[in-house]
Amino acid sequence: EVPELPKEPKAKLGDIYQLGEHRLMCGDSTKESDIIKLMNGQKAEMVFTDPPYGMFLETDYSKIKGSEKSIGFKGNKKGNKYNKILGDNEDFTDLLISNIFKNFKYCKEIFIWGSDYFVDLLPNYGKDGSWFVWNKRSSEAQQKGIGNCFELLWSKKKHKRIVYNFEWFGFLSKDDPKEARNRLHPSMKPTILLTKIIQSYSEKNNLIADIYLGSGSTLIACEKTNRKCFGMELDPIYVDVIIKRWE
C-alpha cells in the first residue's frame, strides 16, 4: 500500500536505514561518495533504476501536472498532486547517468528507464544492449489520453526484445487499481511490472541497486521476490514514503 506524503519528513540527507535485508540512503546519486556509503563494500548483481530524466531535458511530450480537476473517461477521478521533484529546476547533468556506469561497471545486468532521452550517454549509444517496451495503454480511447503511451527500458546486456503490456493510465490500472489510485510520484512504475522484470533477469537473494529509488517500487518488488535492494533517494519526503511502504 502506498502511504500519503508526509508534510514534514523525518529523514535527513545522509541518513541510512536498514530495512530487513534492504538498505536505504537519503543521498545524492551524483556524488560518488554517497554511492560508496550506500553499497558499504558490497557489490550488486543488477542495477535497476529510473533517473530523473525530466530535468530541463527536451522530450516529445508535455509533463502531466497534478491538479484537483476531475479526470478519467467519465470525469470520476480527481487528479493526483505530486510533490515537487528535487532538482527539477536544474540543468540535466551527465553525472546522473555516468555515475551508474562508473560505480557499477562490474554489473552484467544494468537496466535504465527512459534511456531513449539520453542515448548519447549510453555505451556505444545503446547499440550493444537491448530495448524493452512498456505499453501502458490497451484501447484507442486510452491512446488519446494525456501522457506517454509507452516507456522504454534499456539493458546493458543483450536480451530478447519484449513488450510488457501493463495498463497504467496515471490513475487507472486493471493489474493493480489500488496502487494506481494512490500513485504519489510522477515517474512511479507499477510494482507488478517491476516484479516481473526483476524475476526474469536476476536470481533469488541477488542484490539489486537502485540509486534513483523514487517512491520505492524497486525495493517493494525486491521484497516480494526475495531479492535485496540497496536504494538511494534524494528527497527526504520520499525516503519516509519508502520506509512506510516497506513497513
Which residues fall in each region the model found?
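Class I S-adenosyl-L-methionine
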Residues: E1-D15, G20-M25, S29, S33-T49, ...
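Nucleic-acid-processing active sites and adjacent nucleic-acid-binding tracks
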Residues: N83-T93
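Short, conserved SAM-binding segment of the class I
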Residues: F92-N103
